[in-house]
Curated annotation (Swiss-Prot):
This is Elongation factor P. Involved in peptide bond synthesis. Stimulates efficient translation and peptide-bond synthesis on native or reconstituted 70S ribosomes in vitro. Probably functions indirectly by altering the affinity of the ribosome for aminoacyl-tRNA, thus increasing their reactivity as acceptors for peptidyl transferase. It comes from Azobacteroides pseudotrichonymphae genomovar. CFP2. Transmembrane segments: none annotated. Its main location: cytoplasm. PANTHER family: ELONGATION FACTOR P, ELONGATION FACTOR P (EF-P) FAMILY PROTEIN. Pathway: Protein biosynthesis; polypeptide chain elongation.
Amino acid sequence: MATTADFKSGMCLNLEGRYYYIVEFLHVKPGKGPAFVRTKLKSVTTGRVIEKTFNAGVKIDEVRIERRLYLFLYQDDMIYHFMQNETFEQVFVERNNIVGVDFLKEGDMVEIVVHADSETILFAEIPIHAVLTVIYTEPGIKGDTATNATKLATIETGASIRVPLFINKGDKIKVDTRNGSYVERVK
């Protein structure tokens, strides 16, 4: 059992039988009345973010989780197969339990979050930034840049993102996997 004084970002909680991890929290001590903690919690299963307020000092069930590095091997329909490099143990994760799945390619290292007591896989997260190759994009027209102009590009994983006009087919780009946005061109 943990109290609100133990809260930290990334901590996993069990609320009403569902697992959430803390995205953001703020201890508030108003001038009048008792202190409380305002939090933003992200559901492990659905990815939905909720806001919840706790009274200061309340005991909450903390869930012990472990983050383990796995190598992405291949995709079989909606199931993704991973292997741990040290033990060569293979596990699989369903597509809807992988954060940033549209930017995952074979050979990428992925963090899989596991419940420490029951060894069940909760979800998988790919790194925040991924370097991917553009396989198709329309050529940019010079002089067509009145504002911050972008165009649609298809990357090697099959996902489509918006990129600046100077990006061409075959260029390597860095993509933010949290929101699917272009970060920079990689040489």
